[in-house]
Design a protein with these regions (language model features):
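Long, contiguous binding/interaction regions
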Residues: 1-38, 54-59, 72-74, 80-82, ...
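Post-Walker A helix-loop "phosphate-sensing" segment adjacent to the P-loop in P-loop NTPases
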Residues: 69
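Short hydrophobic/aromatic beta-strand micro-patches
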Residues: 48-50
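Short amphipathic alpha-helices in soluble, non-transmembrane regions
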Residues: 60-65
Length: 133
């Protein structure tokens, strides 16, 4: 039983690293969805954010990749959508990272589709800076 808890803990830590990578590249509206209680979920966590333009979306993807690689040595199993950078998906098995252009995020509404998951708001560096003013 302890082995399973460690695995879940590792996936949550990985999701938080992804969120940190997003925040480092000024990703917008960063959300973690905990899907562990959903039997049919394809992964333990979704980590979702938006970018302003395709180059911003690509930069966020690069930031997530670098942050996770530096901290854990892990590479994603697969990255989809990097070429057009409207919706990039990074599959790390235990977590899946979604980086959208704002309008694509509104169109696909992943947070609504997976509303049974527990939404975990991420406190970002930009939010901390704004609250100090």
């Amino acid at each position: 039983m302890a082995k399973i808890k460690a695995k879940i803990s590792e996936s949550e830590a990985l999701a938080k690293l992804a969120a940190l990578g997003m925040d480092n590249k000024k990703g917008l509206d960063i959300v973690m969805l905990d899907l562990r209680e959903i039997e049919s979920a394809p992964t333990n966590f979704f980590v979702i954010c938006s970018g302003n333009v395709p180059s911003h979306v690509s930069a966020i993807c690069d930031g997530v990749f670098e942050t996770i690689k530096k901290a854990t040595g892990l590479n994603p199993n697969r990255i989809e959508g990097y070429e057009n950078a409207e919706w990039i998906l990074m599959d790390y098995f235990d977590i899946v990272v979604h980086i959208f252009l704002k309008d694509k995020r509104q169109h696909y509404r992943l947070e609504e589709l997976w509303a049974d998951g527990k939404e975990i708001k991420i406190e970002t560096n930009s939010a901390k800076s704004n609250s100090k003013e």
